[in-house]
């Protein structure tokens, strides 16, 4: 059956808006497709990722039901600016993977900053024929969700595929499901052959392997065999090896026997660079005001930021209007409200006072000592950025005459930030600590 006809038939399963906005825009890529591997092009990377996540399995299932044939489905970006490298990947190698790699996850599309440069450097260094499996092995990347761990993992995978290597990328859930399914079907030999005979093993969210001893035993032997054969192993997790719960000591020891690299929340300039990169790659035009608003109003989860950009682009496309700051504020209001409800000014005051080693009562007083004034202005600045408090409410909190005093303090601290890089970094560090605490 013609894959385009499959998409047409999906009309019956989806709402009219869903179909028109996310399915009708897909174009079947006959050149890259095979009998059991269907490739569809979407207008840009963000839409491709969204459609792959939400509708990829549905399209695959619908194709099997209608045609009687099984096929994996890949939704990829069709863009003039898309790296030519992402189109050079051999389909035969892609089919060997547990989960299809996202071709847009490359080193070129990864934004490097102080928060991730060590992890990036380690992954980039081993992505060469004479280094793979030999230089740093294994590599263990850890950090909060949504900061780019999967991007780096798959960047290594895509680079390895271009070198003709056999790559297995799997989440812990994929690995566990593979094992359970093959155990049930009496085909563990097939499972062992798949995982042990690869050149590069990429495991996402390795912390979830700690469900049963049998799963960990299987992974232990697979890990050792790949390592002994000079295969490359890279894993991601939310915590470093020594803090993984439910994982055996011998596995923790293997995980730590290489490079351990953390990824921390990005600073403001890195967040802005990430937003610009996403917009440039997808031909989406956002003004500096909108980019700065997104960067300062949202947390550090890059996937959430991408989701906002997708939503803005979708709103503008569907409504046929320009993306304005007002539209951005409207689209983002629920996200910002949810975050701000978790943060109080008392939380901010407590953290800033601890940092400056001063009393909260001094900051709330009218004392004019320089360090107290600076701390007070930082609290006001962060409260404006991270809470829903209005200027009059802040004036009341600090027992100031009216909101113009708050406005004056915001202006002064903004000027100080522009002229003092170390102060800017300190405020960004405080902001990240507050956001991380609010999400825990």
UniProtKB/Swiss-Prot annotation:
Renumbered residue ranges of the record's region Domain IV, binds dsDNA: 317-440
Residue span of region Domain III, AAA+ region: 100-316
Residues that coordinate or bind ATP: 146, 148-150
Region feature (Domain II): 75-99
InterPro entries linked: AAA+_ATPase (IPR003593), Chromosome_initiator_DnaA (IPR001957), Chromosome_initiator_DnaA-like (IPR020591), Chromosome_initiator_DnaA_CS (IPR018312), DnaA_C (IPR013159), DnaA_dom (IPR013317), DnaA_N_dom (IPR024633), DnaA_N_sf (IPR038454)
GO CC terms in record: cytoplasm; plasma membrane
Stated name of the protein: Chromosomal replication initiator protein DnaA
Domain notes: Domain I is involved in oligomerization and binding regulators, domain II is flexibile and of varying length in different bacteria, domain III forms the AAA+ region, while domain IV binds dsDNA.
Family: Belongs to the DnaA family.
């Amino acid at each position: 059956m013609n894959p385009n006809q499959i998409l047409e038939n999906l009309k019956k399963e989806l709402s009219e808006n869903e179909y028109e906005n996310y399915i009708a825009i897909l174009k079947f890529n006959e050149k890259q497709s095979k009998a059991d591997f269907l490739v569809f092009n979407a207008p840009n990377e963000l839409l491709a990722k969204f459609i792959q996540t939400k509708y990829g399995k549905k399209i695959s299932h619908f194709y099997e039901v209608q045609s009687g044939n099984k096929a994996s489905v890949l939704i990829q970006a069709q863009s003039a600016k898309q790296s030519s490298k992402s189109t050079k990947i051999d389909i035969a190698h892609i089919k060997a993977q547990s989960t299809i790699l996202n071709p847009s996850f490359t080193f070129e599309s990864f934004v490097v900053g102080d928060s991730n440069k060590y992890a990036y450097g380690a992954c980039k260094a081993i992505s060469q024929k004479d280094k793979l499996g030999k230089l740093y092995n294994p590599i263990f990347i850890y950090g909060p969700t949504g900061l780019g761990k999967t991007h780096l993992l798959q960047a290594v995978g895509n680079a390895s595929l271009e070198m003709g290597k056999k790559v297995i990328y799997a989440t812990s859930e994929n690995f566990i499901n593979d094992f359970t399914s093959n155990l049930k079907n009496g085909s563990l030999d097939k499972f062992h052959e798949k995982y042990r005979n690869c050149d590069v093993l990429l495991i996402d969210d390795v912390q979830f392997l700690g469900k049963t001893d049998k799963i960990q035993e299987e992974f232990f032997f697979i890990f050792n065999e790949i390592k002994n054969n000079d295969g490359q192993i890279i894993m991601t997790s939310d915590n470093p090896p020594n803090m993984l719960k439910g994982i055996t000591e011998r596995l923790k020891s293997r995980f730590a026997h290489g490079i351990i690299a953390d990824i921390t929340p990005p600073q403001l300039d890195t967040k802005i660079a990430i937003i610009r990169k996403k917009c440039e790659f997808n031909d989406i035009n956002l003004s500096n005001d909108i980019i700065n608003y997104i960067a300062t109003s949202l947390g550090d989860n890059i996937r959430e930021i991408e989701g906002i950009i997708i939503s803005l682009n979708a709103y503008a496309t569907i409504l046929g209007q320009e993306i304005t700051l007002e539209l951005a504020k409207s689209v983002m209001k629920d996200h910002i409200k949810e975050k701000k409800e978790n943060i109080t000014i008392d939380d901010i005051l407590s953290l800033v006072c601890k940092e400056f080693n001063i009393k909260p009562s001094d900051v709330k007083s009218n004392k004019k000592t320089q360090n107290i004034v600076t701390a007070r202005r930082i609290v006001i600045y962060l409260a404006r950025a991270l809470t829903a408090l209005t200027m009059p409410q802040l004036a009341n909190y600090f027992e100031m005459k009216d909101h113009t005093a708050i406005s004056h303090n915001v202006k002064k601290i903004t000027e100080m930030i522009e002229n003092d890089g170390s102060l800017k970094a300190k405020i960004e560090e405080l902001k990240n600590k507050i956001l991380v605490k609010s999400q825990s």
